[in-house]
Regions:
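Catalytic loop of the DD-peptidase/beta-lactamase superfamily, centered on the K-T-G motif
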Residues: 17-53, 180-185, 189-193, 197, ...
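Secretory-pathway/luminal and periplasmic proteins that interact with or process carbohydrate-rich
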Residues: 50, 108-115, 125-131, 188, ...
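Coil residues (strongly favoring Ser/Thr
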Residues: 113, 147, 208-211, 289, ...
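Catalytic-loop motifs flanking and including active-site residues across diverse enzymes
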Residues: 78-82, 115-116, 171-174, 241, ...
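Residues that line or immediately flank small-molecule/substrate-binding pockets and catalytic motifs
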Residues: 8, 108, 123, 277, ...
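Bacterial Sec-dependent N-terminal signal peptides
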Residues: 1-19
Length: 440
């Protein structure tokens, strides 16, 4: 495998050249060659296609390549469509986000304490059914709505409703049920009639195992021996309104533009949906920033597939990445965003471990904050990333100041030191970003 060791650390040069398509392609090609990204990428700005390309195979058995029109399962990117369905009904006065869950499912435990608003922004406390071990043996079965709800209905709440935030597919499953009860249609019918058809999204739909779709990608993953195999074929009755949609990168762009241009909802409803509540999460979508650039985004993951969709309103920039081998679409998407904003991005490469004087590791031990908390410990003459409740991950030296995660995740820790070996600065590099580590 060819090794690529490059850094995009010259944003002024990038700006002067304005050769974004080449830079985006350079990164995406490396992601394909080094990390085996398999899928389709789209970068749009101000109505113009900056970069659009497909990689790898849609069907490995028949050697059919992915194209820019390939349809993929998008997992939890579905949630923003579900939220929009709820807000459409709210805008028509048919429901309120302040309604209690008990109004629609009267026998739901503590349903009088849980509101539609809480379901929309993951503050209901309802446990996430995909975290339950008993779900996955049943995931291949065409479970009824009642059977699905029974999986989590009587589980203790993770916390008192409205007090905390915890991602819950269960909450968005229940929102689909509410759409059906209020509209009198199936969730699929309501979504099709009120969003998909109206926006002309010809390659977007709710999936099921019986569907025969032109240009559909199969989902893949590697087994323990590193051999490609088909991903688990789960029934779409499980993901339902939390993650059962299929789409293309182009349709996701069209959807994003329509949502932000108030072509889906009235302006007040759009604003409510895109308001950050707890943990910078709106209704079915996240709101944060990349440096100084406001970002509205969500990722998705379902066996064999991963997706990422982002939009920067002030910059009119949209990035859509969908994979059919579980590749980290989010990290690729963030890297492409960073390139568009002239931020430093490390192009993927294959690192090589070298021997160093392990005494220098003592200078790196400590607790830091980057994209999240990072604790570095020294153990048996080696540096590790430590996290309570998880196995320690070895950080292997690429040099005395640069270390790569031994889990092949493409993450790095880098340090700047003075002449005595004392650390001056440190950075976490991963998920498409290079972020300085601050001492806790």
């Amino acid at each position: 495998m060819k090794r690529i060791i490059l850094l995009l650390l010259l944003p002024l040069t990038i700006t002067a050249q304005k050769n974004y398509p080449e830079l985006l392609n350079q990164y995406a090609q490396a992601e394909f060659k080094i990390k085996e990204f398999n899928g389709t990428v789209l970068v749009m700005q101000k109505g113009k296609s900056i970069y659009k390309k497909a990689f790898g195979m849609a069907d490995r058995e028949w050697n059919v390549p992915n194209t820019t029109d390939t349809k993929y399962r998008i997992g939890s990117v579905t949630k923003q469509f579900t939220a929009a369905c709820i807000m459409l009904l709210a805008g028509q006065g048919k429901l309120s986000v302040d309604d209690k869950l008990s109004k629609y499912i009267p026998d739901y435990p503590k349903g009088d304490s849980i509101t539609v608003h809480m379901l929309l922004n993951h503050t209901s406390g309802i446990t996430n059914y995909t975290d339950l071990p008993e779900f996955w043996p049943k995931a291949i079965l065409p479970l009824s709505t009642d059977s699905m709800i029974a999986l989590f209905k009587n589980k203790p709440l993770d916390f008192s409703p409205g007090t905390k935030w915890n991602y819950s597919n269960s909450g968005f499953f229940l929102l689909g049920v509410i759409v059906e009860k209020v509209s009198g249609k199936t969730f699929t019918e309501y979504l099709l009639d009120n969003i998909i058809k109206k926006l002309g999204l010809k390659n977007t739909l709710m999936d099921n195992l019986d569907s025969v779709l032109a240009y559909r990608a199969k989902g893949y993953g590697k087994n323990r021996q590193g051999v490609w195999q088909q991903a688990m074929q789960i029934s779409m009755e499980g993901p339902y309104s939390a993650g059962a949609m299929v789409s293309t990168v182009e349709d996701l762009y069209q959807w994003t533009k329509a949502l932000h241009n108030n072509q889906v909802l009235a302006a007040a409803s759009t604003q409510k949906m895109l308001t950050p509540y707890k943990e910078n999460y709106g209704y079915g979508i996240g709101i944060d920033s990349l440096k100084t650039h406001k970002r509205v985004s969500h990722s998705g993951g379902i066996p064999g597939f991963a997706s990422y969709l982002s939009y920067f309103p002030a910059d009119d920039l949209c990035v859509a990445v969908i994979s059919n081998n579980g590749s980290n679409s989010s990290s690729l998407g963030v890297a492409l965003e960073s390139i568009m904003f002239n931020l430093p991005v490390q192009i993927p490469y294959t690192p090589k471990e070298v021997k160093i004087d392990t005494a220098i590791l003592d200078n790196y031990v400590g607790k830091y904050i980057a994209t999240g908390p990072i604790e570095l410990i020294k153990k048996n003459g080696k540096l590790y990333r430590h996290r309570d409740g998880s196995a320690d991950i070895e950080l292997k030296p690429e040099s005395k100041t640069r270390f790569f995660y031994a889990d092949n995740s493409g993450r790095f820790i880098e340090f700047e030191i003075d002449k005595t070996g004392k650390m001056i600065k440190g950075w976490f590099i991963g998920n498409g970003e290079k972020v300085e580590m601050k001492n806790q």
